[in-house]
């Protein structure tokens, strides 16, 4: 989990638009963020394995 202060800081409107960055909506992680799903790779994997993300399945071949 990211610090609460960092999560609040990311939500505030920035003075300059280039400073804005994405954070995971679940845990607040800033790295390995997937825009399409709005979450980081770790939360994405957990939710996909539980079947909480429609249309996403684990691949096997």
Curated annotation (Swiss-Prot):
PROSITE patterns cross-referenced by the UniProt entry: RIBOSOMAL_S14 (PS00527)
Recorded GO CC terms: cytoplasm; small ribosomal subunit
Gene3D superfamilies the UniProt entry points to: 30s Ribosomal Protein S14, Chain N (4.10.830.10)
Record keywords: Metal-binding, Ribonucleoprotein, Ribosomal protein, RNA-binding, rRNA-binding, Zinc
Binding site for Zn(2+): 24, 27, 40, 43
Known cofactor(s): Zn(2+)
Stated family: Belongs to the universal ribosomal protein uS14 family. Zinc-binding uS14 subfamily.
Subunit structure: Part of the 30S ribosomal subunit. Contacts proteins S3 and S10.
Cofactor, free-text remark: Binds 1 zinc ion per subunit.
Protein name: Small ribosomal subunit protein uS14
Top-level taxon of origin: Bacteria
GO molecular function: rRNA binding; structural constituent of ribosome; zinc ion binding
A Gene Ontology biological process term: translation
Gene from which this protein is expressed: rpsZ
InterPro entries: Ribosomal_uS14 (IPR001209), Ribosomal_uS14_bact (IPR023053), Ribosomal_uS14_CS (IPR018271), Ribosomal_uS14_sf (IPR043140)
Function: Binds 16S rRNA, required for the assembly of 30S particles and may also be responsible for determining the conformation of the 16S rRNA at the A site.
